[in-house]
A protein has these predicted regions:
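Short helix-coil transition/hinge motifs at the ends and kinks of transmembrane helices
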Residues: 32-40, 179-184, 338-340
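N-terminal low-complexity or simple alpha-helical regulatory segments
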Residues: 1-135, 151-152
Length: 383
C-alpha cells in the first residue's frame, strides 16, 4: 500500500464486497426471515435482491482484478501487450467493466425496487435498452480517445439515473394510491421506506457512474455508503409483506380486471345498502387485513363496482374502513368511561380492528384533527 488512505480504501472496498456477498447468500440459502419472523416477503423480491447483491459482489471482484492487472501485468497480459498497446488494452478492460456494471447494476436494482410494488408486474426491457447508448459511447471513446465520448457517456448515465428516479417515484406514488384503494391495514405494506430506498439508490448510482472514477474522495464515499445501503436494502426486502392471495398480485394487468363499462347508477346506489347491512351492521370492518376483494365477495358485488362506489363518494377503501373503526373506537371509549371500566387507548384500538397502534394513531389524527390523547382529554378529561 502506498499510504494509509489506500489501506483504508481497500478495507472499505473489502467490507462492501463481503456485505454484498453475505446478503446474497442469506437470501439464496435462508428460507426463514431473520429480520421479521412474522413477515413473509415476496419470493420474487428476494430473488431480485439476491441478483442485485450478486452483481454488486461480482462488480467489486472484476474491478479489483482490473486494478491489479493495470498495475502489474501478468504473463498473459505481457504476451497480449506485445501485440496491442497496453494503454489501449486497459481501456478495453475499463469499457467491459463499465458496461457490465451499467447493465447489471441498473437492471437488478430496478428489478428489486419494482418488485416492492406488488400491484402489477412492470417490464424491465426499457432499462436494458437504455444501457445500449452507454456501450456505444464507450466504443466510440476507444476509437476516438480524446475524452469527448467518455464525457458524453458519463452525462448520459447521470441523466438516465435521474429519469429512472422520476419513473420509480411516480410508480411508487401510484402504488400508494392502489394500496389505499384495496387494503384497510397497511402495516408492513407501506412504501415510505421504498421512497427512501429510491433516493439513496439514485444518489449512489449518480456518484458511481458520474464521479467515482474522477475523484478519489467520491470513491471513498461510494464504498462507505454502500455497506449501510446493503444492510438497509436487505432489511427492506425482509420487512415487506407479501400480498399473495389478495387483489392484484402477480398479474400482468396494471389493475384488477375491470368491466368494459362503468357500473350502472342503480348498482352503485344499491352498494350503499349492501355495505350498511353486511359491513357496518355486521361489524365486518373489525376483521384485520380485510381487503377490497374480500369485502366485495361478502356483500355480493364486483370489486371494481365497489371501488367505483368509493370513488363516487370521494373516499378510498382505506379511509372508509378506518373511518368505521375510528367510530367504533369512539363508541368503545364512551362506553368504558360511562361504566368506569379500566382501559388503555391501545386496547380499544385493537378491539376496533387496528393491527398496530401507530396505524390507528395516524388514522385518528387525520380523521379527527387531534391526537388520541388530546381528543380524550378534551372530550372527557380522561387520558
Amino acid at each position: 500500500m502506498n499510504s494509509v488512505g489506500d489501506l483504508l480504501f481497500i478495507m472499505l472496498y473489502g467490507g462492501a464486497t463481503m456485505a454484498s456477498l453475505i446478503a446474497c447468500l442469506y437470501l439464496l440459502l435462508r428460507k426463514g426471515n431473520a429480520f421479521a419472523p412474522d413477515v413473509t416477503p415476496p419470493l420474487t423480491l428476494r430473488r431480485w435482491a439476491a441478483a442485485f447483491f450478486a452483481v454488486s459482489c461480482l462488480g467489486h471482484f472484476w474491478w479489483l482484478l482490473l486494478y491489479f492487472y493495470s498495475r502489474h501485468l501478468n504473463m498473459i497480459g505481457v504476451m497480449v501487450a506485445s501485440v496491442l498497446d497496453t494503454r489501449h488494452l486497459n481501456m478495453i478492460g475499463l469499457m467491459v467493466a463499465s458496461v457490465l456494471d451499467c447493465v447489471g447494476m441498473l437492471t437488478t436494482i430496478t428489478g428489486t425496487l419494482l418488485a416492492m410494488l406488488q400491484d402489477r408486474k412492470r417490464p424491465l426491457w426499457p432499462v436494458v435498452i437504455a444501457t445500449m447508448p452507454y456501450a456505444v459511447l464507450w466504443a466510440l471513446h476507444l476509437a476516438y480517445p480524446d475524452g469527448l465520448f467518455l464525457d458524453l457517456a458519463i452525462a448520459y448515465m447521470v441523466l438516465s439515473c435521474v429519469l429512472l428516479t422520476v419513473y420509480l417515484v411516480f410508480a411508487a406514488w401510484r402504488y400508494r394510491h392502489w394500496l389505499c384503494d384495496n387494503y384497510a391495514d397497511l402495516e408492513h405494506k407501506e412504501i415510505r421506506s421504498s421512497y427512501i430506498m429510491i433516493f439513496i439508490t439514485a444518489l449512489l448510482l449518480i456518484l458511481f457512474f458520474g464521479f467515482e472514477g474522477r475523484y478519489k474522495v467520491i470513491s471513498f464515499i461510494v464504498q462507505f455508503l454502500s455497506i449501510p445501503f446493503f444492510g438497509l436494502m436487505l432489511w427492506r426486502v425482509e420487512t415487506l409483506q407479501q400480498l399473495d392471495g389478495m387483489t392484484g398480485v402477480d398479474t400482468e394487468d396494471p389493475l384488477p380486471a375491470e368491466p368494459e363499462e362503468t357500473a350502472p347508477l342503480a348498482t352503485l346506489s344499491g352498494i350503499g345498502a349492501l355495505l350498511k347491512r353486511h359491513c357496518e351492521d355486521a361489524q365486518l370492518y373489525l376483521k384485520q387485513d380485510l381487503s377490497l376483494s374480500q369485502l366485495s365477495q361478502t356483500i355480493g358485488t364486483n370489486h371494481y363496482y365497489l371501488s367505483q362506489y368509493f370513488t363516487q363518494q370521494g373516499l378510498t377503501y382505506n379511509a372508509y374502513i378506518n373511518g368505521l373503526r375510528i367510530n367504533h373506537f369512539i363508541n368503545l371509549y364512551h362506553e368504558a368511561v360511562a361504566t368506569q371500566r379500566s382501559f388503555t387507548a391501545q386496547q380499544l384500538a385493537s378491539e376496533s380492528g387496528f393491527r398496530s397502534y401507530s396505524t390507528f394513531s395516524a388514522a385518528f389524527k387525520q380523521r379527527i384533527g387531534q391526537t388520541v390523547t388530546a381528543w380524550m382529554r378534551d372530550t372527557t378529561g380522561v387520558e
